[in-house]
């Protein structure tokens, strides 16, 4: 999808800036659902995928409560924003700087999402922006009624250690998988050397999951 970037959100005065791309993603999903009959789509069996920021957006959609407005005069806005599944690559699973620092000490990503700049300023601002973190961090939104997700990373985890690429470390995946397990949500985690790998990549997962018999709807 084509969505607004953080710089566009800042220029438009959207607060926090991350709201713009995430709500654009939700609107795109609603638009696709509104065209389900015309485009011969199953409105229930819709998954999301993406890499890095697109992965974070996909997980946000997977875990966020439905943003549909059934009373809206806009027929697109009445459509559900819930997913059947999500399969993502290199996802940032949290936007909480404290969690990032604990999982990967040399973390440096995320402050721009809330308009607070560099990572030290992000940490300092955490308490002030905590309501935003609770609304926009995928980890914070996980609940038992959420759809299954699949996470792929290019390197194995090293929790508590500095990483070469802390923005795309599989440490994010390990901690989300633990959290999902505690909530009763299926979360497949794949990285080099990962155990019990059923699907080698996100595409294989989506084909298998979206093609299976529907057990329960997520809309």
Protein language model annotation of sequence segments:
Residues 27-103:
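Primarily recognizes the serine-hydrolase "nucleophile elbow" in alpha/beta-hydrolase
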Residues 2-43, 196-197:
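Catalytic nucleophile-loop/oxyanion-hole region of alpha/beta-hydrolase
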Residues 20, 24-27, 31, 56-60, ...:
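Extracytoplasmic/secreted proteins, especially bacterial periplasmic and envelope-associated proteins
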Residues 149-164, 170-216:
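C-terminal catalytic histidine-bearing segment of alpha/beta-hydrolase fold enzymes
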Residues 62-72, 91, 97-141, 147, ...:
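Mobile cap/lid helix-loop segments that gate and shape the active-site cleft of serine hydrolases
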Residues 79-84, 143-149, 183-186:
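Short, proline-enriched alpha-helix->beta-strand connector loops that line the catalytic pocket
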Residues 4-8, 52-56, 92-95, 156-158, ...:
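Solvent-exposed loop/turn segments at secondary-structure junctions
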């Amino acid at each position: 999808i084509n969505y607004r970037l953080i710089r566009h959100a800042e220029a438009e005065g959207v607060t926090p800036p991350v709201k713009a791309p995430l709500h654009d993603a939700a609107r795109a999903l609603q638009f696709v659902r509104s065209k389900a009959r015309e485009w011969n789509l199953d409105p229930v069996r819709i998954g999301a995928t993406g890499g890095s920021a697109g992965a974070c957006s996909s997980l946000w959609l997977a875990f966020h409560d439905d943003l549909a407005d059934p009373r809206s005069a806009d027929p697109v806005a009445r459509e559900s924003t819930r997913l059947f599944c999500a399969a993502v690559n290199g996802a940032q699973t949290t936007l909480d700087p404290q969690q990032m620092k604990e999982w990967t000490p040399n973390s440096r990503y995320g402050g721009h999402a809330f308009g607070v700049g560099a990572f030290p300023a992000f940490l300092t601002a955490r308490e002030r922006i905590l309501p935003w973190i609770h609304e926009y961090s995928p980890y914070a939104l996980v609940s038992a009624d959420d759809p299954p997700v699949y996470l792929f990373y290019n390197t194995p985890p090293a929790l508590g250690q500095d990483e070469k690429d802390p923005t795309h470390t599989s440490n994010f995946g390990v901690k989300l998988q633990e959290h999902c397990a505690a909530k009763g949500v299926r979360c497949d985690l794949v990285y080099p050397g990962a155990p019990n790998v059923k699907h080698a990549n996100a595409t294989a997962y989506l084909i298998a999951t979206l093609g299976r018999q529907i057990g329960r709807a997520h809309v």
